[in-house]
Amino acid sequence: LGQAADRGADAVVDLADDQAIDAGLAAAAPGGYDLIVDFLWGGLAPHAINHANVGARYIQVGSSAGPTSTITAPAFRNKLLTLVGHGQAATPAEVRRSAYAQLMRHAIDGKLTLDLEHTRLDDISQTWERLKTGPPRKLVVTP
């Protein structure tokens, strides 16, 4: 959790137990959530839905916390939620190829800014230590 906060997260939620999850979600957005992008699913999804605003959109992307979840019908129905699944498998290969080509064009044209740090392999230990507390960036390691 400390690393997420150090890297710019607006809020972090302790997943130790149900009370901590609910308290963390409530503290992070006292007015509730209009959009939830869920990479975890599992037992955490019901907590997120409980803190969703009426009419919220719930985008289900991953299942790091488990492939199944138990959501009560009233919690889902009374919130008028829109549940959308999103995954690479649902995106046609041509769309992915086109998006990647556009990304590369932006990179070639200098429209992408990447925060890179170059380091030598011999210096990798010191670089890793510095990255633990410094700003996030992509690391390029050379011999």
Which residue stretches match the model-derived regions?
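Adenosine-nucleotide cofactor-binding segment
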Residues: 1-44, 95
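Terminal peptide-recognition signature
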Residues: 4, 36, 48, 83, ...
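Conserved helix-to-beta-strand junction in the class I
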Residues: 50-52
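Short, glycine/polar-rich helix-capping loops at beta-to-alpha or helix-loop-helix junctions
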Residues: 1-5, 68-73
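Short beta->alpha connector loops
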Residues: 41-43, 64-67
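Rossmann-fold dehydrogenase core element
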Residues: 54-61, 71-113
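C-terminal hydrophobic helical "lid"/dimerization subdomain
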Residues: 94-143
